[in-house]
């Protein structure tokens, strides 16, 4: 049954100066991973409940889509609207893909939901000084594009949509960037875990929230023959996807080195959080979210100790 009732957003999380007061700046990296991003949502909600603030977040794909609620300080919003609408045929799935060319509906998932049905708090988002950056992939060059979002308006929402537009099952999103019109797809193709980029931005403390457990290694994409045909007009994206497992695993190696050296604090799933591209069972989303909450609580003391060093 379709639910057309407008949803009144829950109160936002208060900013907590007692947790924020520290000498060094903090940058956080949020990996994507589709609905494994519910894990990230759980971690971030725990942080907000504790009143933790950081100076910058960079999100990729689902990390951008769900991480924006940290800047708007909306505890529980990401898991709430996904559980509410995951069974709605207007939200996502094969029917939406065949009708629109996008796995997730632009008009419903990126317009009706944030503007009317579970309202995104643009006032808090725009007034919060925390830097929020999303990563997209430039279809023409294959290079990552890093875009700071300030207002949370529909243009910002489209940048989030671009960051989460999975190749093959999404159309490129056209947006203006530095005076040029770009065609953009999922940032995970060009820079899946932008720890190196965040380190280059000058933040003294680095934190990464991953969506795969320790020891995970990405394997070559088995569907490359299909992907090559589907993306024959996007050769740079095809090249990225062909070598994505190698770049991703190299990033994991870099993360392990930074973590061992004490230069990076990593939160990763304590158990497997496998998730298909589309989940229609609200309980599956809740289960992944709860793993994130448990890990967020379990690591919170160590996180504060790292930030205080």
Language-model features, listed with the residues they occupy:
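Patatin-like phospholipase
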Residues: 1-60, 68-309
